Amino acid sequence: VKNVFYVIIDAFCYNNLERKIGDEYTTPFLRELANGNICAKKMYSQAPYTEASLVALLSGENTLDNGGYLFGNRSTQKTVFKSFKEKGYKVIGQYSPYVYSKAYLRDIDQYFYTRLVSIQVVFDYRLSYYKSRYEKSIITSNEIRVCTEILEEEFETWIGQAESLLQKDDTCILIQDWQSIDTIKKVLEGLKKEKELFDENPTTYLYNIFEEFDSHNLLYLNRMYNNKRVIENSVYLENKYQEQFEVLQKKYTGIIRKDSPDFKYLLNILKNNRSGFRDFKGLVHNYMRYYGNNFLGEYLKSINNNTQTEVCMKKQFKHAIKAVNSANAAGMPGMVYLHVQDFHLPTAIHSSDYEDINYIENEIEEALCLGNKIDRGYKGNIIADLSARYCDNKIRGFYNDLVNNFGNDFKLIITADHGYPSYFNPPRSVIYNQTFVEAFHIPFIMCDGENNYSIDSISSSMDHFSIINNSDNWKSKRKYVLSEYAGPGCPDISDKAIWYTYIDNEYRVSVELKLCENISYDKLKGVYNIIYDKDEKNNLVKKAPNIVEVKTIMDIIQKRHNELKHKFENEKFLKSFFVEK
């Protein structure tokens, strides 16, 4: 039985494998793996955003089943982690507590933190939605219950991590020096006082959060807890490389500003889109951001603000190999799940928390060397492409370390939770909540020299390991992808519109529906023929009634919508959270 390593790259599009700077591919190693191993060129992720995809990957559940993916992982009966455990594997994973429910850990044997808890994200992406409902006096008792459950888990996780840091627990080994002992003690004392107030009356405490929000004491404690120390060598690096970054920024700015805005696209949005003027303003704004960015010029100056939010990939990979070696020594194969975010913006092009300054200098110098190859034909976001090269190099190093440690006794799976457009290339009216095809078109690479059959979905890797066979939840051959999304954190679907996005090889159709509604042409938000309109600029929504394929697609979406309605109305779990008004 071979050791298994899953590397899930956050926001990794398939087209990253084909991007170039000058005559050089930005991800040469990943491209080599994709061409030399099992690779799915038509892979679509099941859902476009992190948690949704994670639940789908681990459990095979449809995204919004079981009350939205905030609770989906908690309620699913069997995860992939559990399946590997039953096969005798020791399951090892990293934990990013500011994103995932602690239920994520329940079938993991050994985990390690890769970042400090941040409740700011909970305020921004969970509680802000309910705050607006509270202010309108329309928040329901079930929604209050959801919020108090979120807070209860946040207290448990945050207090637990702070105590583990003080105890120098193995789960905190990679973030042990990210905060001083005195600060952790002060924050822990404050947290315990807040927890006492919460326990006295959770609803009253929640209302206080809604009313105070940005000035609430939890966010004060959060700022203290996440106050990043000045990164070692940052001043040295700025003094050595700042001028070179500014020269490259000037060259890049000159190249992108030679392109005029796409006036046809601007007019098309203004004429055809039902939210035309708003989206027109959004597109103009994003053009200004595209032409006016200063990513490279500010990169080194902002190291202390934008980095050290997560342990660098090299440290995570090194720790994972060590954990698997320990499992092997105890007579067990290891299964590792790593969700790395280095591809995301704002991101890094060097391992800022690594100790070896020579190693860091080599990373920066390679980035500058690649960046200087941009020419007049270059389009895109240079920092995103340099980040892609950084990520590619880390995975190359990881692969070599796997070979050195395990020989052929391992399998490496590389995929993504979702793709993402190259920022502002092309500039688009909507970046956030986007449903463009590249958000779904992700690579799937499995390094396995013993089997040479093609794979077209994440679930097929489960078939490969004989983990799950012939399950209705695991479709190996998809003719289309249907994603469902209900907003950041997807807190519940009782009174929120669900965004459905259907994609096949010809059309991308997006619809916005509440559970109480049925699909109709006026609910369509986007209809694009992606054969002839690869950049998805020509919205055919007004012509939809005359497109035969769209009616078929609408029927598929309505069928899924009916399933959610049925589950919402009948399942005990959902009733307990979301039915009461």
Predicted regions and their residues:
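Catalytic domains that recognize anionic headgroups
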Residues: V1-K581
